[in-house]
Amino acid sequence: MMDPIPNQSITAWPWPDELDAVTAAPDSHRILLENAHVRVLEILIPPGHREPMHTHRWPSVMLIDVSAAIRYYQADGQTSDYPRRAANAQLPHIGWLEAEGLHAVENRDSVAYHAIRIEIKGR
């Protein structure tokens, strides 16, 4: 049986620990559970708030339960805008994310953005 979770070499991670989301953007990232296998983060970005640049070292499952219009900033200065999910959209929105390099998120909405991120360690 194939492993559905792609492997990632932790030794190849190019960013320092100081840029980890919990350290670099502690106002929007709170650890709910951490062990040798997973780290579960609560992500809360208030309206009008822009997080500091940070990283997520491990691939993860993201569950967005309160959507908001956000702007995603990449390290190279490129931005991407994402609208708030429609009122009739099914929430939570669940997706797979690979490890994320240096980035920041800005909440450009009047509601707080809220998500749970389950990071898979050692992958």
Outline where the language-model segments fall.
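Glycine- and acidic-residue-biased ligand/ion/polar-headgroup-sensing regions
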Residues: H56-Q78
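A short, N-terminal "cap"/entry segment at the start of jelly-roll beta-barrel domains
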Residues: M1-E42, R50-M53, Y72, T79-L102, ...
